[in-house]
Amino acid sequence: MSGAFYVFTALLLVASDQIAAESGKRLEMYKHDVMAASNAVVKSLPNRFLRGSRDEPDNLANEERTVYSVLASMINEGVSKMPCAAEVVEKISHTTEAVENMPRAAKAVKKRPRGAKAGRKMPRAAEAEAVKKVPRAGTAVKKAPPLAEDVKEMPRAKEAMEELRRAADATEDMQRAKANDLLKALIGADEALKKHWTPSGNTAAIGDTSYDVFNKVILSLPEWKINFRGMKSMAVLDQHRENIDLVHKTFEILCDKNVKPTAAEVSFIWSMMEWKGPNPEKYHRRNLVRQAQRYVFLDLRNVKKR
């Protein structure tokens, strides 16, 4: 469930200087072989906590209730809003069936000229019937069976053309369904976000981390960009220590100096940031949020398919 880690990191860098894992010192990656993807986010949320910005227990409790309940509810409802996978599978099966019929259709279409030729020969068949009494009648009768066979091919050719048309329509419908499914998913997730996030942000005390999360992380899900490059971890060798130090330094600038991600986590976070921008802090934040959006969206789709 990679998206959960990315969105958590984005919240850390964008919204709060106090988000961390159970140790209060470091983030922890999700282990794909430990938790099922469909339950990774919701099950792990209660096991994490949001440190109080003023180290007050009441403040901590408020943040924990507000932020994690919002995230869990948003994810649950967002998943429930996803289009039914069965409908998509059914459309794909229709398309597959139509495509399987295409070779037969093509073969029948090849015979179509014979059918047309047979149609042109039909008057000759009548003439053959009329001249049965002449010596050449026997020859005309011999030609009749192939003629009848060609005439029989005409309905098959028409049926084949219908199969080709249905295959084309099914392919077009499937492409249109994918676009509609994507739009429905985004709209549903956006509705869930507004429903669960807005009330919690309005009720949170000014200055609390949960209030800052609500006010600083403004995501319009239908505008999510999903064409980012794939995440790649780098081998954490001694020569990469400069990169690790740079990420830690960035964490101190944007977050809390005590937040120290592991070397493996740094390798992912490094690829999420935008180091070449003219304003690194600004571009770091923007790129992290976009990466989080992309991977959470992909995770939601994967959860629905399971």
From Swiss-Prot:
GO cellular component, one term: extracellular region
Main location: secreted
Composition bias type Basic residues, residue spans: 107-123
Location relative to the cell: Secreted; Host nucleus
Renumbered residue ranges of the record's region Disordered: 105-142
Positions of transmembrane segments: none
RxLR-dEER, short sequence motif: residues: 48-65
Keywords linked to the UniProt accession: Host nucleus, Secreted, Signal, Virulence
Signal peptide start and end residues: 1-21
Role of this protein: Secreted effector that partially suppresses the host cell death induced by cell death-inducing proteins.
Entry domain remark: The RxLR-dEER motif acts to carry the protein into the host cell cytoplasm through binding to cell surface phosphatidylinositol-3-phosphate.
Similarity comment: Belongs to the RxLR effector family.
Protein name according to UniProt: Secreted RxLR effector protein 76
Organism from which the protein derives: Plasmopara viticola (Downy mildew of grapevine)
